Amino acid sequence: MGVFQKGEDQKGESANMKPIPLLSSYDMGKFNLSHRVVLAPLTRSRSYDNLPQSHAMEYYSQRATKGGLLIAEATGVSSDAQGMSVIPHTPGIWTKEQVEAWKPIVDAVHAKGGIFFCQIWHVGRASDMEERPISSTDKPIEKTEENYFLGFSTPRSLTVEEIPDVIKHFTLAAKNALEAGFDGVEVHAANGFLLDQFMKDGVNARADEYGGGVAGRCRFALEVVDAVAAEAGAGRTGVRLSPYSRCLDCADSDPDALAAHMARELGSRGVLYCNVVEPEMVATPAEGGSGGETMRIPHRLRAVREAFAGTLMVGGGYDREEGNWAVAGGYADLVVYGRLFLANPDLPRRFRLGAPLNGYDRATFYTADPVAGYTDYPFLDDDGDDGLAASAASASSNKSGDQDGV
């Protein structure tokens, strides 16, 4: 667990303004964070031909602050690691050209004093390519909670002999991320993608050492984490988990046990942080809903908090008020914001001032336009914006249903 510190006075903030937990400083290993508002890894589909583009320099630097943590969008570890035509143009980091393309983007974040981690992923069976994608299983995705796409290819089950090659791809991606200048690497083991497909028993029915009980199902993900940590250092390695998610037809029958196992294993390895997606459930009328809508299970991650000694990040629908609660109560060290940060490049400043938030434009989440819905969200007007201070309610009212990344 990192060190909680009393927040320093923020620029332009009145000395007698009530302290804001989200804006207190925090030591995450060797990294000194000036606040606890983290940019989620958000797929934006603007890396044409899997190559990061110059417009990403502006996008990320807009959201960078001195001592603020940004996590880059999911970045492929190999040519077959990404394959969703419905979400095209995702970046990679397996070639020299891609590494060179990332360098000026990373430099732009560092020029603002930001801390930048690269999220590395493999989509597994979440692919619609002609060549059969790899997974823990040969069963295709049959339904998605999102209902945005159902044309996934039928996967083939990865053989035990092939697993070391996939691990090598993650290792190379970690090496390349550091060469590009990133401060660290986040292993994407969440949201129904390859590593999650191994971890959850709703998908993984293998009878070998990579299946069966929770320890076997988590073996592959932990071998990837071990390899990445050996390359980058445990103090520069984070992991993203979503044990409670049903995303992409990938669910587990005992998510509490899965969450606790991964928290213990990652803690024993000394990885820098866990970035965990908040649990959700489908409400029934007896639970107070009209039936069928998704509702967050409040604060179910306490078991992860207790089992993992490193930095715990949480995300999935948090607003300003809830984020402050999570930090002040020790429920989490950092709070990850996706759609709120997407639409408000100056989100930490707006939180400080209690300022109104921009709404997001869902239609532009995954379009290829280098400006619209990407770098054109407005900042607060510098003329007189301090007059907006202390209206926390205005910020809290901008509930977004934020799911903090893909």
From Swiss-Prot:
Name this polypeptide is given: Putative 12-oxophytodienoate reductase 12
Organism: Oryza sativa subsp. japonica
One of the GO biological process terms: oxylipin biosynthetic process
Function: Putative oxophytodienoate reductase that may be involved in the biosynthesis or metabolism of oxylipin signaling molecules.
Cofactor(s) needed: FMN
Record-listed E.C. numbers: 1.3.1.-
Similarity comment: family membership: Belongs to the NADH:flavin oxidoreductase/NADH oxidase family.
Keyword vocabulary terms for this entry: Fatty acid biosynthesis, Fatty acid metabolism, Flavoprotein, FMN, Lipid biosynthesis, Lipid metabolism, NADP, Oxidoreductase, Oxylipin biosynthesis
Residue numbers binding FMN: 41-43, 74, 119, 240, 317, 338-339
InterPro entries reported in the protein's UniProt record: Aldolase_TIM, OxRdtase_FMN_N, Oye-like
Keyword Magnesium: no
Matching Pfam families: Oxidored_FMN (PF00724)
Binding site for substrate: 188-191
MF-aspect GO terms: FMN binding; oxidoreductase activity
Top-level enzyme category: oxidoreductase
